[in-house]
């Protein structure tokens, strides 16, 4: 399975995966074979940043 391309759908997908799997974004990126920096940039592009206190993008 690939990560969604649309940034808003990607946000929902990533937050769901982080919650369900209990992993960090870098681990998720590695699992899906994507560069963490690109994932981070795509989500920052729509105004979301990772909050490690709750393990999600807000």
List the predicted regions and their residue ranges.
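N-terminal acidic leader/helix
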Residues: 1-24
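Short, acidic, Ser/Thr-enriched surface-loop or helix-capping motifs
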Residues: 52
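Short acidic, Pro/Gly- and aromatic-enriched capping/linker segments at domain boundaries
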Residues: 35-49
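Short alpha-helical "recognition helix" segments of helix-turn-helix
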Residues: 28-29
